[in-house]
C-alpha cells in the first residue's frame, strides 16, 4: 500500500493504517460525508 499525505482520504477502516510520507502511521477519522487521515 502506498504512502498517503496528511489529510488525504482513506477507506475509513480504523485498523487499516497506511504509512505517511515521513514514515509515521496514519489513522482514520470520520467526517459526516467522508473519511480523512491523520498521522
UniProtKB/Swiss-Prot annotation:
Expressed by the venom gland. Disulfide bonds are present. This is U2-ctenitoxin-Co1a. Keywords: Calcium channel impairing toxin, Disulfide bond, Ion channel impairing toxin, Neurotoxin, Secreted, Toxin, Voltage-gated calcium channel impairing toxin. It is found in: Secreted. Omega-agatoxins are antagonists of voltage-gated calcium channels (Cav). One of its GO terms (molecular function) is toxin activity. GO terms for cellular component: extracellular region. Belongs to the neurotoxin 04 (omega-agtx) family. 03 (type II/III omega-agtx) subfamily. It comes from the Eukaryota. It comes from Ctenus ornatus.
Amino acid at each position: 500500500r502506498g504512502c498517503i499525505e496528511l489529510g488525504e482520504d482513506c477507506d475509513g477502516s480504523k485498523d487499516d493504517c497506511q504509512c505517511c510520507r515521513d514514515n509515521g502511521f496514519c489513522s482514520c477519522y470520520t467526517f459526516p460525508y467522508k473519511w480523512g487521515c491523520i498521522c
